[in-house]
Amino acid sequence: MASRREFLQFGIAASALPIAGTGGLSSDLLTSDEPARMPLYKVVFDERFPDSVAFGVEMKRLGVPAHGIRGDITDFWLHDLDPRWKKGPVAIAGLTAHGPLFCLERLSWDHQMRVVFCAEHRCLDDGRIEHAISGPDIMQRHSAELVAGGPNWAAHMARVVAHCPPSRSETSKTTIITPLTTATDEADRVPLLSWVIAPVVKA
C-alpha cells in the first residue's frame, strides 16, 4: 500500500492528466439579503500560474489566509492541514491544477468532507476561457458576473468562492465564456480548477 507521502507526490503527476468531471471575510462581501458564508480555514493557490496567484491575492484582500504551493501539497498537508483536520473538519478552497485537488479531495474523505463547489477554467483555441461551473445556486448567480469581469476572472472567482453557503443547498451547472487575460504559451494553458472542500452536512 502506498504511503501518504507517495500518494501526495502522485498528485503532482496527476496534474498533467485529463480532468474527469469536474477565515473571516471582509465586509464588502456581506449583504443583508444573502445567506451566511461558510468560514474558510485557508485557501490554496499555485505560484506557477498568474491566475492562481491573482486568486490568492484577492482572497488575502478579503481576509482569508492563503497558502502558496508549486504543484506539491506535501508540506502544506504534513505541517498545516493534516494537524488541523485531526482537530476537526474545516472548509478549505483553492485555485489549482487537477493534481492538488485530486489529493486533497481524497484525503478529505477520511474527515467526512467533500467537494461542494468546482469550476474548471480552460483556455480555448480562439483565445477565450471556458468556465464550467458546478455548485450551489447562490454561487452560480455570482459566477454570472464573470462576463462583466472579463480578463480579471481569477479575482472574481475568489469572490464567488467566498460566497459558498455553509449548509446543503440546491446545485446546478453552467458554462461561461470570458476573454483571455493575455496571450499565453502552451505551459500557461494548463486547465485550472477553483474549488471548495467542506464538511458533509447531513439532511
For every predicted segment, state its role.
Residues 7-11, 43, 55, 92:
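Long, contiguous hydrophobic alpha-helical segments, chiefly transmembrane helices and signal peptides
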Residues 1-5, 24, 202:
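Eukaryotic intrinsically disordered, low-complexity regions
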Residues 47-61, 65-76, 85-203:
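Long, low-hydrophobicity ectodomains and other hydrophilic envelope-associated domains
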Residues 14-17, 23, 96-97:
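General structural signal for secondary-structure boundaries
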